[in-house]
């Protein structure tokens, strides 16, 4: 019987438990699209194949949670930054620590390798950007100019520029040769999370928390395009290989955009939640996402995705070359001039001292997969690399997930087995074979302490929202088969209850909206607080946070007690809104509050000053109440922890 033809556009490869605690960073290898690196709260970096459940290698050495991870272009080196501000670079082929770099005063929030030279750039919550020489083990230059955390760094394809994105709503371009800032791009209305250079032309794309992707001409340093329609902050973008379009990973969706003119070519539903990184290989787009301690990998068949103004042509036989569509942007834009190189493989750098090598180990968890990927047998260096085969698509009528394997964490000693029949081998450029240093099995570590549950917004199904929770308990002595009428009755009961919840929510929003339409923001917040519905307050703050000028001192008095409730909420969206609101209050009003409280009393009666002093005292008191809460949550990993640590730094002026 013939197998059904693969007709799916998107499918899930697998879901695995990557760490014994929260995953703080996930990144794909852009060269092969087959390697995944994860950093976690356990201070380790784990290497995975996107379609295999077993950990290939575990990299140790950091003493604080890992905040950011990045491969180099050839996927032979990997760098990881930690909460303490240190960087560690590993040689994956030699399975050794290469460098340990110290210098940042806060979390390392962004990393990137230079495309040609042996340099690494790092950005931090301390607002500084450092350029490191891997060979000399030192900082070459420090770039200062951002006022808030640096979230993303990218070298230009020719290696002459460095672009940085920050929470201060700006993108800055730095000239590496001159060591100074070339331009500042500041059209975004929210923190900038991700930036990508066009592979050929002088064009830069930036994704922001304002839910837009903006395109910048790097010859004139002007905005040439802006997308609309994203429902959540943009965190993952990637240009196509030919540069004709850009892929934007959103909440359970993939959008394909063009520019000049701005247009959305296609929208593809993908169940990846909030995607963390994207890569392209063999006309397939690979996406990875994380939720607490799990990571998931997904595939999108680009032959079935509309990437131009014309309709997609469907699957193309492997023997027929695929014609690439013409770029949508202007063809007159300047093109990068890449330096000529005689060898694509970088010179081998000597490892660090023996003491650092003992502290930082590369523990090979799966020797067979490690040899297949990093040390292929009978490899001849002058032989051109073979292309890896694309992942086979499941048939359309097969609704089961292709792979969903939960692997044991590498910290627990368990026998790792590999299934070669059902997995794809990773093909890499041939390198000289060498014998890896196989470290001993890691000793078991104690289980992490239980933490209060947090309902993440990056999920495929609602968590904690079950129809049974709204229905009365049914006593039954033995399980019986539910007939159709009973099932319909139960569904209707849950539906009625949910309608009541939504109707109440809409009624509350209508009440607040009536006050909001009069233009009185303070009264609107007061009415929302009086209703005693935190979700309505969150909705209002999401609007106010988009325009910082709406914030006033008397508004802070009302909002700060509500922020305390949001930071203690189990819903991620509530915590995120509370962090953003508290950050705006600290940045705009904390200096004013401290100055007014420290000022000597004036002579005579000044009613307006007395009112300001009273408001400042109330705000200061509430901020002091929030300070221990923020400090206790600053030890968390991931974007949560980064946000609370940044708030903790901003609140240092209270002490």
Curated annotation (Swiss-Prot):
Biased composition (Basic and acidic residues): 358-374
Keyword Cell cycle among UniProt keywords: yes
PANTHER family: KATANIN P80 SUBUNIT (PTHR19845), KATANIN P80 WD40 REPEAT-CONTAINING SUBUNIT B1 (PTHR19845:SF0)
Record-linked Pfam families: Katanin_con80, WD40
Native source species: Xenopus laevis (African clawed frog)
Protein known as: Katanin p80 WD40 repeat-containing subunit B1
The UniProt record lists the keyword Nucleotide-binding: no
GO molecular function: microtubule binding
């Amino acid at each position: 019987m013939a197998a059904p033809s693969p007709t799916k556009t998107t499918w899930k490869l697998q879901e695995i438990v990557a760490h014994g605690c929260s995953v703080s960073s996930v990144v794909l290898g852009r060269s092969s699209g087959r390697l995944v690196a994860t950093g976690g709260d356990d201070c380790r970096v784990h290497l995975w194949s996107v379609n295999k459940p077993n950990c290939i290698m575990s990299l140790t050495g950091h003493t604080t949670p890992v905040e950011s991870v990045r491969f180099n272009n050839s996927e032979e080196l990997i760098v990881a930054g930690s909460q303490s501000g240190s960087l560690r670079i590993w040689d994956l082929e030699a399975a050794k620590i290469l460098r340990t770099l110290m210098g940042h005063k806060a979390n390392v929030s962004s990393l990137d390798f230079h495309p040609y030279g042996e340099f690494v750039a790092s950005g931090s919550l301390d607002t500084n950007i450092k350029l490191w020489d891997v060979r000399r083990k030192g900082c070459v230059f420090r770039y200062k100019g951002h006022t808030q955390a640096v979230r993303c760094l990218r070298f230009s394809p020719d290696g002459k520029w460095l672009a940085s994105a920050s929470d201060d709503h700006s993108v800055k371009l730095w000239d590496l040769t001159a060591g100074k800032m070339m331009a500042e791009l500041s059209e975004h209305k929210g923190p900038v999370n991700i930036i990508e250079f066009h592979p050929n032309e002088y064009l830069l794309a930036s994704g922001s928390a304002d839910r837009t992707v903006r395109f910048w001409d790097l010859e004139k340093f002007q905005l040439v395009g802006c997308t609309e329609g994203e429902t959540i902050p943009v965190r993952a973008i990637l240009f196509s290989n030919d540069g004709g379009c850009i892929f934007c990973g959103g909440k359970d969706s993939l959008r394909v955009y063009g520019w000049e003119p701005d247009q959305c070519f296609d929208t593809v539903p993908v169940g990846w939640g909030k995607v963390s990184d994207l890569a392209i290989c063999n006309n397939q787009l690979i996406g990875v996402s994380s939720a607490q301690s799990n990571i998931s990998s997904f595939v999108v068949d680009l032959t079935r995705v509309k990437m131009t103004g014309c309709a997609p042509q469907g699957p193309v036989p492997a023997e027929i070359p695929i014609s690439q569509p013409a770029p949508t942007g202007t063809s007159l834009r300047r093109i990068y001039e890449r330096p000529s190189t005689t060898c694509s493989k970088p010179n081998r750098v000597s490892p660090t001292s023996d003491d650092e090598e003992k502290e930082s180990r590369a523990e090979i968890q799966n020797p067979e997969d490690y040899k297949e990927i990093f040390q292929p047998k009978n490899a001849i260096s002058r032989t051109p690399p073979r292309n890896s085969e694309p992942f086979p698509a499941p048939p359309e009528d097969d609704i089961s997930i292709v792979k969903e394997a939960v692997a044991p964490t590498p910290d627990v000693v368990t026998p790792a087995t590999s299934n070669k029949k059902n997995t794809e081998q990773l093909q890499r450029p041939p390198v000289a074979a060498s014998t890896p240093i196989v470290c001993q099995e890691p000793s078991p570590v104690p289980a992490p302490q239980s933490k209060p549950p947090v309902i993440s917004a990056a999920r495929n199904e609602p968590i904690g929202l079950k129809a049974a929770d709204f229905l009365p308990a049914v006593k039954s002595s033995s399980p019986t088969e539910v007939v159709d009428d009973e099932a319909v009755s139960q569904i209707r009961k849950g539906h009625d209850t949910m309608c009541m919840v939504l109707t109440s929510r809409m009624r509350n929003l209508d009440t607040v909206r009536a006050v909001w339409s009069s233009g009185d923001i303070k009264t609107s917040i007061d009415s929302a607080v009086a209703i005693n519905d935190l979700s309505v307050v969150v909705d209002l703050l999401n609007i106010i946070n988009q325009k910082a000028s709406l914030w006033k001192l008397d508004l802070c008095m009302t909002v700060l007690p509500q922020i305390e409730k949001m930071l203690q909420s189990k819903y991620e969206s509530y915590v995120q809104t509370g962090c953003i609101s508290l950050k705006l209050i600290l940045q705009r009003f904390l200096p004013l509050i401290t100055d007014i409280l420290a000022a000597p009393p004036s002579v005579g009666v000044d009613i307006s000053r007395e009112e300001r002093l009273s408001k400042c005292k109330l705000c200061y008191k509430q901020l002091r109440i929030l300070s221990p809460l923020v400090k206790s949550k600053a030890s968390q990993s991931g974007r949560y922890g980064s946000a609370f640590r940044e708030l903790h730094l901003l609140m240092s002026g209270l002490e």
